[in-house]
Amino acid sequence: METIQLQPVRFDEIYPSRKNETLRMSRQDIVDVEPILSRREVKRLPFIEANTQEVTIEHLKEDCIVPVFSKDNEITISHPHFIESVWEAANRVFPSEQVETPEIRVSHIIKGRTPEAIHKPVRDLLEEDKTIYYERMMFCFEIPTIYEDIMGNRLNLTIGGVRAYNHENLYSKKGAEKFKIFIGFKNMVCCNMCVSTDGFKSELKVMDVHGLFNAAMQLFQEYNAAKHLYYMGAFKDSYMTEHQFAQFLGKCRLYQYLPVEQKKKLPQMLMTDTQIGIVAKSFYNDENFSTIENGNEISMWNVYNLLTGANKSSYIDNFLDRAYNATQLADGLNKALYGDSEYAWFIQ
C-alpha cells in the first residue's frame, strides 16, 4: 500500500455573502461549487440515524433562513456555506479524484414566522408566513477513487462535518463560530464512519468561511490515510473471546457509575447504556459482524464495527466525538489483548 502524499496548495480568497447563496472563488480555474451534482445512483444506508432526516443543499439554500447573533444582527455562517467550503477544499486537495455530492442530514427544526404573520392564528398561517432552520446539521461525501479493502469490506475515503447551533451563543455578539470537520473512511458494507486522531477537528473555531476553508485544507493535507488504514487493518488479526467481550460490556456499564476520582484514572468511554445494549445485541445478531461463524471469538475488526454501528444512534452534535472514541476504544482494547495496561481494566 502506498502512502498518499498530499501537496500544499495555494488559497486565494473566499468571499462570503450575507445571503444564503453559493460561495464563489476568485480564481476562474477553481471548480465551480454552484452545481454540486450527485453521482450517487444507489440508495445507501444513512451514516447517522437518530432523530435525523435527509435534505438537499437546495432545500437549505431556498427554504431555510440563516440565524443571526441577536446583539449585533451579524449573520452566522450558514449550513450551505459550511458544506461548500469543505467540499471545495476537498476538490483542491484531491484535484484528480472523484469527489461525490454531499449527503446531508439535519435535526431539531426551529420554526418561526415572518413579521407580517406575527398575529395570525396557527390555523391561518400560509407557507410563505413560516420560517425554518435546522439547529443541527451533518454532512459527508465520499472520494470513492481512494479506497481500501479490509476483510472483504470496502472502505471509501470520506470527508464531512457537523454544525450545531446549540453550541453557539446566538444571544450575544458575533464571535468565533464552532464547527467539527473530519476526514476518514466509510465502511460501505454498513456505512459506519471510521475517524482517526489526525483526521478530526472536534472544535474548530473560525470567524468566516475563509477560516473554514483554510482549516479544512490543513486537516486534509496533514491526514495520513495509509497510517489510519494500517491501524484498522491490524484489527483483523486480533480476537476477543466471548468472556472478554462480556467483560468489556459489563465494565462499560459500570464505567457510567464509577466514582469521579476512579473514572479520571481510566480512558474516556462515551457510549451510552442504550448503545452498549445495541453492541451486545449485535454481537449475536449483526448480519455482517456477529460471531456466529467463529464460535466464541470475535475479531477486533468486528468489535470496532459493532462500536461504530451503535454510534449511528447518536444525535448529530455527539456523533463525531463518539465515532472517534470508538476508534480509541478499539485500538486500546486491541493493545490490552497483548498486555498493554491502559485499557486493561475494560477486559479484566
PLM region spans:
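Intrinsically disordered, low-complexity regions enriched in serine/threonine
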Residues: 1-42, 119-348
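Feature for intrinsically disordered/low-complexity regulatory segments and propeptides
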Residues: 1-87, 95-97, 105
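A short acidic/basic microdomain associated with nuclease active sites
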Residues: 92-131, 135-138
